[in-house]
């Protein structure tokens, strides 16, 4: 049985302490912020330098980095 934070499997998002609903971080139905403490709320999206992944990034297939940055 997957954990409550494994949103990709359960499609139910329970964000950890300090998480906001600003950006989607763990699947289309989930709105955990990048600092979410839940293990299932992490996505692999590598942007160049110190640039962060954009709000539309839900995984490697649709990685969107901040303006002026490139995705690896």
UniProtKB/Swiss-Prot annotation:
Question: Per its record, what triggers expression of this gene product?
Answer: By cadmium.
Residues at which Cd(2+) 2 binds: 19, 24, 38, 41
Q: Which UniProt keywords apply?
A: Cadmium, Metal-binding, Metal-thiolate cluster
- A GO term for molecular function: metal ion binding
Binding locations of Cd(2+) 6: 53, 65, 69, 71
Q: Which residues bind Cd(2+) 4?
A: 45, 57, 63, 71
Question: Which residues are involved in binding Cd(2+) 3?
Answer: 26, 30, 32, 41
Q: Which domain of life is it from?
A: Eukaryota
* Annotated positions binding Cd(2+) 5: 47, 51, 53, 57
Q: Identify the residues that bind Cd(2+) 1.
A: 15, 19, 32, 36
**Family to which the UniProt record says this protein belongs:** Belongs to the metallothionein superfamily. Type 2 family.
Summary of subunit composition and partner proteins: Homodimer.
The task this protein performs is described as: The metallothioneins are involved in the cellular sequestration of toxic metal ions.
Name it: Metallothionein 20-II
Q: From what organism does this protein derive?
A: Mytilus edulis (Blue mussel)
**Lineage, opening ranks:** Eukaryota, Metazoa, Spiralia, Lophotrochozoa, Mollusca
């Amino acid at each position: 049985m997957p954990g409550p934070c494994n949103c990709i499997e359960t499609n139910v998002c329970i964000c950890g302490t300090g998480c906001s609903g600003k950006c989607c971080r763990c699947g289309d139905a989930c709105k955990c912020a990048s600092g979410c403490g839940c293990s299932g709320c992490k996505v692999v999206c590598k942007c160049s330098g110190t640039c962060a992944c954009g709000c539309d990034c839900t995984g490697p297939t649709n990685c969107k980095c901040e303006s002026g940055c490139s995705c690896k």
